[in-house]
């Protein structure tokens, strides 16, 4: 290669044969299409276990081994050293279910080595979150908000938002409730506390004994309950200025915001007509 003074090599894995001469190999290495060995797509609003399942589906790693790695304190310690502004002692709070919950950014990740190590796969997702945190660093500082709290707020917005929802208004409801010392009463935190996925939270579920249960505890939960897209990050740091303290989702996905319990109850009576409709923000 040095003899041929070649350059412009493509990264990736290539299949070469013994019959190829130097010119043929150089041509292969410089002109071959850049095709990834595999890709992993992580959608918004996914919990760590769901992401582990996604990674397992595209690799030879089992979901169990992936979760073990994600919860491994030595691995987390290395991440803290490499990403000190993102991974802090906040993730080691004794009340947190999984330290890296919410820290694996939703995106499509391309990997060109079929033998990519699990650490590298996870770190690719952490790095994306770190870059986003750097982008919003000034806004977080202006709001005196840690990255961990910003991620937590963003995760609540992500889990509550529908396609038609105004995330900035949902954000304002959460901030208004916190300022009034009202519990957030957001259903996704109850489901996270229970470790369940279902369409409707029952009254008995609201009694879940967990620091994540925002019906029983005021303020934010101990940490994120899922990952969040950038739109939810942005909404978490830029809530609309409103007086809303309630909201509910109609069956068609439209979100109705109200300022008083009386208005909220009227909206419930008008729009929540059967058990398939899901009440929010009460």
Where are these regions (language model features)?
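Extracytoplasmic/periplasmic/luminal assembly and interaction segments
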Residues: 1-28, 95
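Bacterial extracytoplasmic/cell-wall-associated proteins, especially those involved in peptidoglycan
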Residues: 41, 59-61, 75-282
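Extended intrinsically disordered, low-complexity coil regions enriched in Ser, Thr, Gly, Ala
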Residues: 61-71
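Generic alpha-helical secondary-structure signal
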Residues: 28, 54, 69, 124, ...
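Membrane-embedded segments
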Residues: 18-37, 43-58
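Surface-exposed, secretory/extracytoplasmic low-complexity segments enriched in Ser/Thr/Asn/Gly/Pro
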Residues: 12, 53-57, 64
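Surface-exposed aromatic
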Residues: 5-15, 34-36, 104-105, 244-254
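Short, glycine/proline-biased beta-turn/loop segments that scaffold the active-site neighborhood
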Residues: 1, 70-76
């Amino acid at each position: 290669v040095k003899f041929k003074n070649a350059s412009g090599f493509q990264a990736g894995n290539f299949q070469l044969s013994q019959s190829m001469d130097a010119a043929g190999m150089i041509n292969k290495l410089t002109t071959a299409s850049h095709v990834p060995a595999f890709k992993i797509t992580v959608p918004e609003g996914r919990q760590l276990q769901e992401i582990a399942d996604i990674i397992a589906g595209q690799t030879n790693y089992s979901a169990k081994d992936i979760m073990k790695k994600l919860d491994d304190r030595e691995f987390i310690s290395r991440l803290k050293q490499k990403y000190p502004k993102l991974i802090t002692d906040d993730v080691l709070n004794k009340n947190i279910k999984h330290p890296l919950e919410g820290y694996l950014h939703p995106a499509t990740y391309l990997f060109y080595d079929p033998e990519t190590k699990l650490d590298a796969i996870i770190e690719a997702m952490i790095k994306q979150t770190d870059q986003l945190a750097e982008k919003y660093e000034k806004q977080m500082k202006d709001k005196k908000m840690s990255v961990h709290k910003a991620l937590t707020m963003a995760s609540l917005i992500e889990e509550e938002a529908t396609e038609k929802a105004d995330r900035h208004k949902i954000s304002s409801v959460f901030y208004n409730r916190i300022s009034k010392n009202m519990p957030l009463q957001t259903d996704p935190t109850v489901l996270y506390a229970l470790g369940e996925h279902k369409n409707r939270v029952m009254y008995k579920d609201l009694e879940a004994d967990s620091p994540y249960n925002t019906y029983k505890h005021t303020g934010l939960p101990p940490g994120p309950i899922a990952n969040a897209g950038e739109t939810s990050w942005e909404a978490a740091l830029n809530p609309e200025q409103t007086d809303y303290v309630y909201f509910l989702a109609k069956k068609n996905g439209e979100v109705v915001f109200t300022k008083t319990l009386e208005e909220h109850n009227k909206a419930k009576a008008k729009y929540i007509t059967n058990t398939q409709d899901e009440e929010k923000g009460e």
